[in-house]
């Protein structure tokens, strides 16, 4: 699953919303989740958000990819995986920043069976967004070319399916998720959230993919301004 959670406080109080999103993740039965717009111990949200979320999920593991300092803490991306998963490496890759744009990063968890990277490309500068996409491709090429494990890249690309940014990513990555609209959750008019598989890593079999619009234990129109995207694959 890939989900821009908007700091867990876009529309609802933080404590209520993080519990609801944890329930939604449980209901989805996702084995790994990439998350965008995460705060860590900021003035506006003085919580270690991923720590609280993974506790609510029953002891999952996490990595916070710090993109920039913010209000005394940090802001960035995250990946979470179940507690039983064997993690080999957790690290963060800085992405290029254009003038007037925010710093961005890739949060990476490498396990014994797969690699997951999460990022949130720039929303202000098309130049920065394209440069960031090229660095994402280079990161995969330099670290995971002919990798014997599948490598996944997920997140809010702030780019539509026909954009140069997505075309650039698709030179190195197969698009697994559907191109159904993901933003905004209350009036979805554009697809900007994606799940990719690196072409030069171990193959996977795509079973299904969909943008998630309904949960028994949560309301997507209250949880975030984005819709979560979900892909079921066999390794």
Regions inferred by a protein language model and the residue ranges of each:
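Conserved hydrophobic/aromatic beta-strand scaffold that supports enzyme active sites
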Residues: 2, 77-79, 90, 106-108, ...
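N-terminal, active-site-proximal structural segment of metallo-dependent hydrolase catalytic domains
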Residues: 1-56, 69-73, 134, 225, ...
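Active-site environment of divalent metal-dependent phosphoester hydrolases
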Residues: 7-9, 40-45, 70-72, 124-127, ...
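Active-site flanking residues adjacent to catalytic metal/cofactor-binding acidic residues
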Residues: 3, 36, 119, 154-156
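Metal-dependent phosphoester-hydrolase catalytic domains
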Residues: 127, 131, 141-152, 158-235
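Structured beta-strand-rich core segments of catalytic domains in phosphoester-bond hydrolases
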Residues: 13-14, 38-114, 207-212
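Loop/turn elements at helix/coil->beta-strand transitions in domains of secreted/extracellular proteins
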Residues: 28-32, 58-61, 112-114, 147-150
């Amino acid at each position: 699953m890939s989900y821009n959670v908007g700091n867990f406080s876009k529309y609802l109080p933080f404590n209520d919303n993080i519990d609801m999103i944890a329930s939604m993740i449980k209901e989805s039965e996702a084995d790994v989740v990439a998350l965008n717009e995460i705060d860590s111990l900021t003035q506006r949200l003085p919580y270690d958000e991923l720590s609280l979320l993974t506790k609510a999920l029953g002891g999952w593991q996490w990595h916070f990819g710090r993109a920039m300092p913010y209000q005394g803490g940090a802001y960035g991306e995250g990946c979470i995986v179940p507690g039983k998963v064997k993690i080999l490496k957790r690290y963060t890759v800085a992405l290029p920043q254009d003038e007037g744009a925010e710093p961005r990063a890739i949060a990476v968890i490498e396990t014994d069976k797969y690699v997951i990277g999460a990022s949130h490309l720039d929303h202000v500068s098309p130049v920065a967004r394209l440069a960031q996409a090229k660095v994402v491709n280079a990161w995969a090429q330099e670290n995971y070319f002919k990798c014997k494990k599948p490598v996944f890249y997920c997140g809010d690309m702030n780019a539509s399916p026909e954009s140069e940014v997505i075309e650039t990513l698709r030179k190195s990555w197969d698009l697994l998720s559907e191109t159904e609209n993901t933003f905004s959750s209350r009036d979805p008019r554009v697809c900007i959230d994606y799940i990719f598989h690196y072409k030069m890593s171990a193959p996977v079999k795509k079973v299904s993919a969909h943008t998630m619009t309904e949960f028994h234990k949560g309301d997507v129109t209250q949880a975030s301004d984005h819709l979560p995207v979900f892909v079921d694959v066999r390794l």
